[in-house]
Amino acid sequence: MDQFQALIEPARQFSKDSYRLVKRCTKPDRKEYQKIAMATAIGFAIMGFIGFFVKLIHIPINNIIVGA
């Protein structure tokens, strides 16, 4: 029985700690959620433009190298 308890105790402690953490956390309010969503959208747009311009620059360079 002691071996069984020693095996189960870490999982039980982890579940108790996880439950306590979730109960302590708070959901973001509407203003905070909109701020996070806007920052994420701006980040996606910036990364998209960077990828587009890199592709735009490398297409002519690739055509020069392959076409030669």
Swiss-Prot record:
Keyword Transmembrane helix among UniProt keywords: yes
GO molecular function terms listed in the Swiss-Prot or TrEMBL record: protein transmembrane transporter activity; protein-transporting ATPase activity
Keywords, in A-Z order: Developmental protein, Differentiation, Endoplasmic reticulum, Membrane, Oogenesis, Protein transport, Translocation, Transmembrane, Transmembrane helix, Transport
Transmembrane segments: 33-61
Family matches, as InterPro entries: Prot_translocase_SecE_dom_sf, Translocase_Sec61-g, Translocase_SecE/Sec61-g
Tissues in which the protein is found: Expressed in the germline. Expression in the germline is regulated in a sex- and meiotic cycle stage-specific manner. Expressed in somatic tissues including the intestine and somatic gonad. Expressed in the intestine more highly in hermaprodites than in males. In hermaphrodites, weakly expressed in the spermatheca.
Topology of the protein relative to the lipid bilayer: Single-pass membrane protein
Signal peptide, first to last residue: none
Gene Ontology terms describing biological process: intracellular protein transport; oocyte growth; ovulation; post-translational protein targeting to membrane, translocation
GO cellular component: Sec61 translocon complex; Ssh1 translocon complex
Parts of the chain on the Cytoplasmic side: 1-32
Keyword Membrane among record annotations: yes
Subcellular location: Endoplasmic reticulum membrane
Residue intervals on the Extracellular side: 62-68
Oligomeric and partner information: Heterotrimeric complex composed of SEC61-alpha, SEC61-beta and SEC61-gamma.
Function of the molecule: Required for oocyte development and ovulation. Required for the translocation of secretory and transmembrane proteins into the endoplasmic reticulum in vitro.
PANTHER family per record: SEC61 GAMMA SUBUNIT
Family classification: Belongs to the SecE/SEC61-gamma family.
Protein name listed in UniProt: Protein transport protein Sec61 subunit gamma
Organism: Caenorhabditis elegans
Gene expressing this chain: sec-61.G
